[in-house]
C-alpha cells in the first residue's frame, strides 16, 4: 500500500458522498470510466484487520498544491477524517481495489414512508451506513462488511423501530461549526474543579468543547492542575495544556456491533488525564478524583509574533535540565539514550523537579542492542527530573519547557522510583487496570502488595511473597500485570522453564542472577511462572534439596536494604500439590484464581469482541451461558476458533475466488456469525472433555428417547432448572444427586446422555468396577480424581453406571482389607461436598437399589429416586419404536402399530432396539441378494419393509421375564413408601 496525505477540502462538493475522496489530476491512481475504489487505513495501523473502502473520483474542485516530493494528496471531507480518527495532514496507506467484493445479501432498515425505489447501478455500501434514499440504513451485509450492492444482491427489508439516528454523512458538512469564542472579559483568575479520568494521549488534558467554553480557555492554553483536598506540602500543581477531544468514529466501531453510531461525547465535568501526568500528580490510576484547574497567568516570554494580535501565556524554557535514569527490567543503566532523548525533546516538553518522564524508544535500534530481554521490543524508558535551572516564574510551582534549542541536558546517574502505568502494546482487555473477570483477584493482589510500598513498609516482618494458583489460561499473569500497573511497579517476568538446567549448581546460579537483576530495578515484582517446575530432580520423582534450599533462602531474604524500595515475588502454578513443602511454606500469601461466573464470562466476551464485527444474531449472553467452566484463555481461544470458522465458511460458500479476491475480501472485512461461534464452541468443548479425561459421547437428544415423559420431567426439574434459573435457588436448597433404578435395558444410560447433550454439560461416565484397585488407598484416590475432573469440567454430569457394584452396603462385603467400605465412605464424603459446587450433578444407575448402602439414599446425596420401567402399553412402546426408527428409511406400507401387535406385551427399550437391529440385518441380506442378481441399482436407498419388521418380531424374545418385572415393581413400591 502506498502512502498518501489527507487534505481537507472545504466546502466539500455536495454531489460527492462524504466518504469519498477526490483525486487531483495527474495522481498515481488514474480513474477509469467506472470509477476507482481505494482501500484506506491509517499509516500507524498494522496491515491486519479491515480497511475502509471508499470511492475515488476526479472533480472540478480537486486542486491541491504539491509541495515538492512526497506522498500524493487525497482531498477528503471532515467526515472521513472522523471515521479514520485522523487529523488534517495525516498519512494513510492507500491501494486501489481492482474487484470490490460483491454483496450476496443485505438487510436494509427503512423508516415508515415511501419505498426504496428502483436500483440504480452498483453502489458501494458499508454496514451501518445510510443509503442515498432518505430514512434507510444498511443493517447487515454478507459475505463482507462493505462492498458493492448490485443487481445480484438479495435484499431483506425491515422497518426501523423508533427514530433513526443520523450518520454524520447525512448532515450538512459544508459549513463546519464555528470555533469556540471566548470574550476578552472572561474571568482569568477563575478556578474550576473537574473530575479526572485516566485516558487520552500525549501530555495534554482532554475536555469537551463545551467544557472548554465554560472554563473560559482557548484550545492549547496552559493551565495549572492539582488534586483537590491535598495539603499544600504534599502535592504540587503541575502544568499542562488543554485540548478538545471530539467523539471518534473509528473504523472498528463503525463496522462493529454498534455500527453507524458515534462514540459517546465527553461529559462537561470530565477531563481525560494522561497516565504520566496522573502519576506525577499522585493520583490513583483507578480513581483520579477531583482536579483543580487554574489558568496560567504568567506573561509569555516568547518572541513577539507579528502575525497574531494576541499571544497565549506560556512557561519559560529551562537553561539546564538534569535527569536520572530509572532502571527497569528491560533497559539497563548503561544504555545509549542520547539519540532517544534528542528525539524526545525535539518537541518542547514540560518538566518539573521530581517528575517522572516517559520517553518512547520506537524506531531506535540502539535501544534494542542494549536491551536485557531475550526477545527485545521497543518499550518506554523512564527518567526522573533531578534539577531544573532557569528563570523561575512566579506561580504555584516551578515549571519549564525543555527542548533541544534552549536547554542543555545532563544525565546525572540513576535512581530508584515507581513508574506510571503504560500500555504494553497488547490488545485493550489485557492492558486494562481492571481486566474483565479478574477484578477481584487484582484487588486481592494489590491489597497484599500495597503495605510494603508504604513509608513504614520496611517495618513489616513478613516477606512480600505471593503464590498464585489456578488452571492454565485463567489469567494469572494478566492479573499480576494489572496489579503492577495500578501500584506503579516494574514487572520482571521469568518463566521457571528457563531456569531449569542439567545440574543443581547451574539452576542455583540462574536463580541468584535473576534475583540480582530484579534488585537493580526496585520497586519490582519478580513474577516466576510455573513454579512447580523448580525443585525437582532430573527424573522428576524427588526433590532437589540444593535448589529448594537456595530458592527458600532467596524468598526469605531478610536484608532491610532489599525492602527499601522492596523486591516482591509472585509465583504462579497450576499444580500446587507438586510444590516442595519448603518452597510452599516460604509464601505467606496464597491466592487462587476464582471460577468465572456467567456475568464475568459475559464481560470478558464483550471486551474481546468490542472491536470485532459481529453478526446481528450473535447473542453474547447466551454464548456466556454455554461457556460455563471456561477460563479467560478458553474464551480467547473461542474467538480465535470462531475467526477460523468464519474463514472456512466463506471459502466453502461455493465462491470461486482467486488469491486476489480473497485479499480484497479480507480488506473489506467479514462478520463473525452465530454459526461460527457454535462451531468453535463445539471444538473447544470436545478438546476440554479430552483434556479432563471425559469420553466423547454421541449426540443424543430427547427425540432419541421415546416415552418416559414423567422421567424426563423429574430429571429436568433436578438438573436443568438450576442451570437456567440460578436465582430461584439462591437459598441453597438444591438437589445434586439423582438415582435411576429399574430393569435392565429401559434406557437409564440413554437418559443420562440426553441430559448432558440437551443441557450442554460435560459427561463423565464411570463404571463401578473400573475404580477398584488392588493397592491400598488407590481406590479412594480414583473416586477423588473423578470428582476433581468433574469440578474442572463444570458444568458436568457424573454418571455412575452399575452403582451397586461400587457402593454396596458396608459391613457385608467379604473383601480383604475393607476396600469397598472405604470406597463407599469416600463417595459419601464427595457427595456431601457437592453443595459448594453449583454446577456438578451426579446420576447413578442400578438394577438393584436394595443392595446399595442406605447412607447413599439419605437427603443431600441420592435423595431423588426415579423408576425407569419397561413399556407395558402399546402407546409408550410406539413412542420408543418411533424414536429408534427415526433415522431409518421405511417403506410407505410400514405400520409400526401392526408390528407391535405381533410382539410380546411387555418390552423394554433394549428389546425394541434388538427388534430394529434384527430387521435391519434382514434388509441388508435382501439388498445384497438383489444387487448380486441385478434386481436393484447400486444407487438405490436401503428401505426397511413391513416384512423385515414382522420377521424380526416373530423371533423376538423379551429380555426380562414377567416374574423379574414383578420383582422390580416390588422394589419400586418399597422405596416409594420410604
UniProtKB/Swiss-Prot annotation:
This is Peroxisomal ATPase PEX6. It holds the Pfam family PEX6_vert_N. Component of the PEX1-PEX6 AAA ATPase complex, a protein dislocase complex that mediates the ATP-dependent extraction of the PEX5 receptor from peroxisomal membranes, an essential step for PEX5 recycling. Specifically recognizes PEX5 monoubiquitinated at 'Cys-11', and pulls it out of the peroxisome lumen through the PEX2-PEX10-PEX12 retrotranslocation channel. Extraction by the PEX1-PEX6 AAA ATPase complex is accompanied by unfolding of the TPR repeats and release of bound cargo from PEX5. SUPFAM superfamilies: P-loop containing nucleoside triphosphate hydrolases. The modification Omega-N-methylarginine is found at residue 119. GO terms for cellular component: cytoplasm; cytosol; peroxisomal membrane; peroxisome; photoreceptor cell cilium; photoreceptor outer segment. PROSITE patterns: AAA. It comes from Rattus norvegicus. PANTHER family: AAA-FAMILY ATPASE, PEROXISOMAL ATPASE PEX6.
Amino acid at each position: 500500500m502506498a502512502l498518501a496525505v489527507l487534505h481537507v477540502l472545504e466546502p466539500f462538493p455536495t454531489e460527492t458522498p462524504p466518504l469519498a475522496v477526490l483525486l487531483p489530476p495527474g495522481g498515481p491512481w488514474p480513474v477509469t470510466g467506472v470509477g476507482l475504489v481505494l482501500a484506506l487505513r491509517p499509516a500507524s495501523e498494522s496491515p491486519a484487520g479491515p480497511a475502509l473502502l471508499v470511492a475515488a473520483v476526479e472533480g472540478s474542485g480537486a486542486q491541491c498544491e504539491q509541495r515538492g516530493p512526497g506522498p500524493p494528496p487525497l482531498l477528503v471531507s471532515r467526515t472521513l477524517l472522523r471515521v479514520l480518527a485522523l487529523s488534517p495532514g495525516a498519512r494513510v496507506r492507500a491501494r486501489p481495489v481492482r474487484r470490490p467484493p460483491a454483496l450476496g445479501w443485505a438487510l436494509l432498515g427503512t423508516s415508515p414512508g415511501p419505498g426504496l425505489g428502483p436500483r440504480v447501478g452498483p453502489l458501494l455500501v458499508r454496514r451501518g451506513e445510510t443509503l442515498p434514499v432518505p430514512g434507510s440504513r444498511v443493517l447487515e451485509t454478507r459475505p463482507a462488511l462493505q462492498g458493492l450492492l448490485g443487481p445480484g444482491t438479495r435484499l431483506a427489508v425491515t422497518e426501523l423501530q423508533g427514530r433513526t439516528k443520523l450518520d454524520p454523512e447525512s448532515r450538512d458538512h459544508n459549513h463546519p461549526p464555528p470555533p469556540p469564542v471566548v470574550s476578552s472579559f472572561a474571568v482569568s483568575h477563575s478556578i474550576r474543579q473537574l473530575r479526572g479520568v485516566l485516558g487520552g494521549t500525549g501530555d495534554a488534558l482532554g475536555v469537551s468543547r463545551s467544557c472548554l467554553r465554560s472554563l473560559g480557555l482557548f484550545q492549547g492554553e496552559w493551565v495549572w492542575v492539582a488534586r483537590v483536598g491535598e495539603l499544600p506540602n504534599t502535592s504540587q500543581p503541575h502544568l499542562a495544556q488543554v485540548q478538545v477531544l471530539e467523539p471518534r468514529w473509528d473504523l472498528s466501531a463503525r463496522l462493529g456491533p454498534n455500527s453507524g453510531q458515534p462514540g459517546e461525547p465527553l461529559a462537561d465535568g470530565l477531563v481525560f488525564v494522561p497516565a504520566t501526568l496522573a502519576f506525577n500528580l499522585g493520583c490513583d490510576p483507578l480513581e483520579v478524583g477531583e482536579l483543580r484547574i487554574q489558568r496560567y497567568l504568567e506573561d509569555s516570554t516568547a518572541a513577539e509574533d507579528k502575525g497574531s494580535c494576541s499571544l497565549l501565556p506560556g512557561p519559560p524554557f529551562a537553561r539546564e535540565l538534569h535527569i536520572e535514569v530509572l532502571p527497569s527490567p528491560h533497559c539497563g543503566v548503561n544504555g545509549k539514550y542520547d539519540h532517544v532523548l534528542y528525539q524526545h525533546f525535539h518537541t518542547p516538553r514540560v518538566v518539573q523537579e521530581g517528575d517522572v518522564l516517559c520517553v518512547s524508544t520506537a524506531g531506535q535500534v540502539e535501544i534494542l542492542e542494549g536491551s536485557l530481554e531475550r526477545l527485545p521490543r521497543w518499550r518506554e524508558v523512564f527518567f526522573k527530573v533531578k534539577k531544573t535551572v532557569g528563570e523561575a516564574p512566579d506561580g504555584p510551582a516551578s515549571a519549564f519547557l525543555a527542548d533541544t534549542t534552549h536547554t542543555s541536558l545532563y544525565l546525572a546517574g540513576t535512581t530508584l522510583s515507581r513508574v506510571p502505568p503504560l500500555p504494553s502494546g497488547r490488545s485493550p482487555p489485557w492492558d486494562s487496570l481492571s481486566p474483565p473477570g479478574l477484578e477481584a483477584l487484582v484487588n486481592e493482589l494489590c491489597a497484599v502488595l500495597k503495605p510494603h510500598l508504604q513509608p513504614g513498609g520496611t517495618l513489616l516482618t513478613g516477606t512480600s511473597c505471593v503464590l498464585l494458583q489456578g488452571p492454565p489460561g485463567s489469567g494469572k499473569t494478566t492479573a499480576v500485570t494489572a496489579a503492577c500497573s495500578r501500584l506503579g511497579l516494574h514487572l520482571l517476568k521469568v518463566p521457571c522453564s528457563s531456569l531449569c538446567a542439567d545440574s543443581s549448581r547451574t539452576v542455583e546460579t540462574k536463580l541468584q542472577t535473576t534475583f540480582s537483576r530484579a534488585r537493580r530495578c526496585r520497586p519490582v515484582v519478580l513474577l516466576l511462572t510455573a513454579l512447580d517446575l523448580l525443585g525437582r530432580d532430573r527424573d522428576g520423582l524427588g526433590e532437589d534439596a540444593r535448589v529448594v534450599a537456595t530458592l527458600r533462602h532467596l524468598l526469605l531474604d531478610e536484608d532491610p536494604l532489599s525492602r527499601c524500595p522492596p523486591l516482591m515475588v509472585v509465583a504462579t502454578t497450576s499444580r500446587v500439590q507438586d510444590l516442595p513443602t519448603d518452597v510452599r511454606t516460604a509464601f505467606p500469601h496464597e491466592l487462587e484464581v476464582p471460577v468465572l461466573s456467567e456475568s464475568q464470562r459475559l464481560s470478558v466476551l464483550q471486551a474481546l469482541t468490542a472491536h470485532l464485527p459481529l453478526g446481528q444474531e450473535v447473542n453474547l449472553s447466551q454464548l456466556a451461558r454455554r461457556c460455563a467452566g471456561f477460563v479467560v484463555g478458553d474464551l480467547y481461544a473461542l474467538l480465535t476458533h470462531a475467526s477460523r470458522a468464519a474463514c472456512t465458511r466463506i471459502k466453502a460458500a461455493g465462491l470461486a475466488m482467486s488469491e486476489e479476491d480473497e485479499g480484497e475480501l479480507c480488506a473489506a472485512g467479514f462478520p463473525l456469525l452465530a454459526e461460527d461461534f457454535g462451531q468453535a464452541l463445539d471444538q473447544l468443548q470436545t478438546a476440554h472433555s479430552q483434556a479432563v479425561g471425559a469420553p466423547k459421547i454421541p449426540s443424543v437428544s430427547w427425540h432419541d428417547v421415546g416415552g418416559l415423559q414423567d422421567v424426563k420431567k423429574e430429571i429436568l426439574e433436578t438438573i436443568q432448572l438450576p442451570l437456567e434459573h440460578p436465582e430461584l435457588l439462591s437459598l441453597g436448597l438444591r438437589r445434586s444427586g439423582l438415582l435411576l433404578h429399574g430393569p435392565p435395558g429401559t434406557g437409564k444410560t440413554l437418559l443420562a446422555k440426553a441430559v448432558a447433550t440437551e443441557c450442554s454439560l460435560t459427561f463423565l461416565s464411570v463404571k463401578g468396577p473400573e475404580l477398584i484397585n488392588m493397592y491400598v488407598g488407590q481406590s479412594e484416590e480414583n473416586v477423588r480424581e473423578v470428582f476433581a475432573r468433574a469440578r474442572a469440567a463444570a458444568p458436568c454430569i457424573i454418571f455412575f453406571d452399575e452403582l451397586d457394584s461400587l457402593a454396596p452396603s458396608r459391613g457385608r462385603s467379604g473383601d480383604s482389607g475393607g476396600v469397598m467400605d472405604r470406597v463407599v465412605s469416600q463417595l459419601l464424603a464427595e457427595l456431601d461436598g457437592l453443595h459448594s459446587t453449583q454446577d456438578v450433578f451426579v446420576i447413578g444407575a442400578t438394577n438393584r437399589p436394595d443392595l446399595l448402602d442406605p447412607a447413599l439414599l439419605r437427603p443431600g446425596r441420592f435423595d431423588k429416586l426415579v423408576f425407569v420401567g419397561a413399556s407395558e402399553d402399546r402407546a409408550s412402546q410406539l413412542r420408543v419404536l418411533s424414536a429408534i426408527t427415526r433415522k431409518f428409511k421405511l417403506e410407505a406400507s410400514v405400520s409400526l402399530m401392526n408390528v407391535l401387535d405381533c410382539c410380546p406385551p411387555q418390552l423394554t427399550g433394549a428389546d425394541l432396539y434388538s427388534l430394529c437391529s434384527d430387521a435391519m440385518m434382514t434388509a441388508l441380506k435382501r439388498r445384497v441378494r438383489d444387487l448380486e442378481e441385478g434386481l436393484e441399482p447400486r444407487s438405490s436407498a436401503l428401505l426397511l419393509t413391513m416384512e423385515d419388521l414382522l420377521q424380526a418380531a416373530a423371533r423376538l424374545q423379551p429380555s426380562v421375564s414377567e416374574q423379574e418385572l414383578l420383582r422390580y415393581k416390588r422394589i419400586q413400591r418399597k422405596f416409594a413408601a420410604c
